[in-house]
């Protein structure tokens, strides 16, 4: 960005650079292109576009959204005599009772980690706060809150400590995500929080044993919570009028309903648009992904996850 030597299309990702790029003046405001094409603009929620805006102008076009929930191992639940809830455990206490039951059968209940961003522990932590009533949910949907000393945050921290102490693997403290995911693939833990991008790994014999996909079920976090946040969108890095038009045309192509479904089927990317009709063929070819799409509407609480790694 500082050099000004940008490609015509700038891919944006986890390290959201929208504001930085917009401030630099090196990327193009694409608000007018959205306004001139209402059908395209309708693909995105106001929240999606606001997230990709700077000073009221849209600079990024999101190609997916980020959600996460709990994956569980059906065989391990059966071994423990547990029946998984259709949607979610009603309360965290109910969830802990299930963890105690799993533990009594010598089954490690959950995957957690602390290295790097502590991704898995972060998702548990976000859920603990985000489902703690209106106040907790508001906190988890506030960007850069200034007060982390409220009772609900303190309580969530204590609950996370409880999970690390009692319900996870011995290598969780200091452990990296990849190792903890492998524990789940190898049926060494019963539950792991993550998003739909992980589903293709369940089918890959490079990651998981053959047939593992059929062992996996999903549920929302206790209290029917689900992380759901907009994602940083791709930007136009040219000022040449003809190249801008071509870049916008590509962004439109990239976000057609057909291509959003292709990204879902091939890479597990969640469609950014909520008005896409999911074909019956997906229910046959990838029933777990179809279940992910179905369960989203049953979430009582939705929230972000960034707050958990600001501590």
Describe each PLM feature range.
Residues 7-8, 39-77, 98, 109-112, ...:
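A structural signal for short loop-to-beta-strand junctions that line the ligand-binding cleft
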Residues 1, 15-16, 89-96, 171-185:
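Short helix-initiation/N-cap motifs at beta->coil->alpha
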Residues 13-68, 96-97, 123, 213-217, ...:
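Hinge/lid segment of periplasmic solute-binding proteins
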Residues 97-101, 141-174:
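Glycine-centered hinge/linker elements that transmit conformational signals in sensory
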Residues 1-24, 35-42, 84-85, 223-225, ...:
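Conserved N-terminal structural module of periplasmic/extracytoplasmic solute-binding proteins
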Residues 54-63, 68, 78, 93-145, ...:
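Extracytoplasmic/periplasmic solute-binding protein
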Residues 53, 228, 270-277, 288-311:
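C-terminal capping/gating helix-and-loop segments adjacent to ligand/active sites or protein-protein/ligand interfaces
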Residues 80-83, 165-166, 205-270:
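Extracytoplasmic/periplasmic substrate-recognition and gating elements
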């Amino acid at each position: 960005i500082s050099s000004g030597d940008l490609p015509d299309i700038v891919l944006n990702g986890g390290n959201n650079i929208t504001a930085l790029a917009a401030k630099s003046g090196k990327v193009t405001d694409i608000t007018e292109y959205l306004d001139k094409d209402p059908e395209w603009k309708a693909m995105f929620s106001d929240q999606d576009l606001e997230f990709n805006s700077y000073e009221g102008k849209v600079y990024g076009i999101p190609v997916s959204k980020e959600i996460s929930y709990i994956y569980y191992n059906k065989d391990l639940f059966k071994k423990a005599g547990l029946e998984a809830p259709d949607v979610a455990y009603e309360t965290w206490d109910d969830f802990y009772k299930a963890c105690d039951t799993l533990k009594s059968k010598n089954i490690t209940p959950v995957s957690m980690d602390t290295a790097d961003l502590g991704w898995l522990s972060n998702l548990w932590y976000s859920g603990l706060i985000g489902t703690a009533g209106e106040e907790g949910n508001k906190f988890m949907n506030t960007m850069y809150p200034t007060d982390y000393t409220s009772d609900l945050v303190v309580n969530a921290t204590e609950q996370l400590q409880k999970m690390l102490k009692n319900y996870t693997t011995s290598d969780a403290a200091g452990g990296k995500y990849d190792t903890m995911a492998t524990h789940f693939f190898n049926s060494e833990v019963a539950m792991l929080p993550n998003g739909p991008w992980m589903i293709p790994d369940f089918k890959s014999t490079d990651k998981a044993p053959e047939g593992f996909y059929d062992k996996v079920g999903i549920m929302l976090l206790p209290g029917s919570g689900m992380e759901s946040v907009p994602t940083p969108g791709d930007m136009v890095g040219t000022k040449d009028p003809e190249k801008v038009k071509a870049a916008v045309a590509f962004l439109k192509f990239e976000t057609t309903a057909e291509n959003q479904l292709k990204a879902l089927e091939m890479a597990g990317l969640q469609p950014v648009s909520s008005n896409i009709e999911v074909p019956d063929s997906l229910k046959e070819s990838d029933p777990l992904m179809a279940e992910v799409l179905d369960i989203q509407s049953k979430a009582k609480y939705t929230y972000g996850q960034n707050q958990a790694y600001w501590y």
